[in-house]
Amino acid sequence: MMTVDEYAKLSRDDRLKRLERGPDDVAAVVRGHGDDVLSRRPDGKNWAPKEVVCHMRDIEELLMTRLTLMIATTEPKLVGFDPERTPDRWAEERQYLRNDTGEALAAFRRRREESITFLRGLAPAQWDRNAIHPTRGRMTIDDFVTLETWHDENHLEQLRRALAGRA
């Protein structure tokens, strides 16, 4: 799998195209699997495929919140997101295992379409708008697109492993 830095070397259009096909890629990986398989965790500490899809849906919402804030505000300080605790807390609080995978995927698709429409509508100078990320420091909108592109691929690999019963 490529690193975040390797994704940063791709053209912006290439990264946007990868983001556009993200929901289709997720759908292709989970297609044909029943709820029992999609709800099965590969081990005690890794997510079930259904939880991964719900996480991707929720991260897309967080991304749009951050992007719109970056356009509306000069160099906002973003609210902390502890990658070690927040995703697991969301999975529990939002009851990911009780969610319908198809509905979560449809919501992810809608949110991603909104994100792509927003991003494609930006003026060239707006791509350099930035925010202060709590752990990564100053990040531009372009940096967030790079990170989200990597994030999709990371979770696609996680989905494949989970469906194969591997952590």
Can you say where each PLM-predicted feature lies in the sequence?
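Acidic/histidine-rich alpha-helical segments that form the ligand environment
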Residues: 17-24, 87-128
